[in-house]
Design a protein with these regions (language model features):
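N-terminal, intrinsically disordered, low-complexity segments
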Residues: 1-31, 185-212
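Select subsegments of transmembrane alpha-helices in polytopic membrane proteins
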Residues: 34-45, 109-123
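The transition from N-terminal targeting/processing segments to the mature protein
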Residues: 45-49, 91-97, 128-132, 207
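Alpha-helical transmembrane segments and their membrane-interface junctions
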Residues: 50-54, 116-151
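Alpha-helical transmembrane segments
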Residues: 60-80, 147
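Membrane-water interface of transmembrane alpha-helices
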Residues: 77-98, 162
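Short membrane-interface loop/juxtamembrane segments of multi-pass integral membrane proteins
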Residues: 94-116
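Alpha-helical transmembrane segments and their immediate juxtamembrane interface regions
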Residues: 139-179
Length: 212
């Protein structure tokens, strides 16, 4: 879907996905950040479960040291994420404007992108944990991933609520831009785009969530 900005609003033009391949896309801010928070939290909980299983099986783990690593990683990720989230949200709200000419990601493309992103993250962490089990007898990597993932995930889910609240206050829909071939939204500051809420009857049925 192509969104053409016209002043404070926008015109939605449906085009073939092949014609839009390789172009930047815009995605709903609250939905995208919430999904990222869910993936990071799930990744952290999966790593924590992996460590607990190793501990129950009397594998190569050090509960005391791993607990310290987990707590430090959780605290660091939470504090750093809170500062980054605050700056990211503030910057986006200051730069909020209607989109000029951008691709609105379709539901099918969004589903495919998110599946690939989650698969790559879980596969990468899984390989890292297996290697850590072979070369280490502490289990610190699993604790580190668990703490960082849970902390960052909580921050993202809290930020998603702020995006939803901002949409309600402004009676609009707020979007973030995904670069070509990007699997997740940028963690740093980026511009945001705004479209007014339209009537539900005007929403294209194949693209739910664009105008509600």
């Amino acid at each position: 879907m192509l969104v053409l900005g016209t002043g404070s609003g926008g015109i939605v033009v449906t085009m073939a996905d092949a014609a839009l391949a390789g172009l930047p896309r815009i995605v709903r801010a609250d939905d995208e950040i919430r999904w990222r928070g869910q993936v990071l939290t799930s990744l952290g909980l999966a790593s924590l479960s992996y460590w607990i299983i190793l501990w129950l099986l009397e594998g190569p783990v050090d509960p005391v040291f791993a607990g310290i690593v987990f707590g430090a990683a959780l605290l660091f990720a939470f504090v750093l994420g809170a500062v980054t989230s605050r700056r990211r949200f503030a910057h986006a709200m200051l730069t909020l404007r209607p989109p000029r000419s951008m691709v609105h990601e379709t539901v099918a493309n969004s589903r495919d992108r998110r599946v690939r992103a989650a698969a790559m993250m879980f596969l990468g962490v899984g390989i890292l944990l297996l290697l850590d089990t072979v070369v280490s007898d502490v289990g610190a990597t699993a604790a580190l991933v668990a703490g960082a993932g849970i902390g960052a995930g909580i921050i993202d889910r809290l930020e998603a609520r702020r995006w939803a609240q901002a949409e309600d206050e402004r009676e609009s829909r707020i979007f973030l831009m995904l670069r070509p071939n990007a699997l997740i939204a940028r963690m740093g500051a980026q511009d945001a785009y705004e479209l007014p809420r339209g009537r539900r009857d005007d929403e294209p049925p194949e693209f739910p969530g664009t105008y509600l």
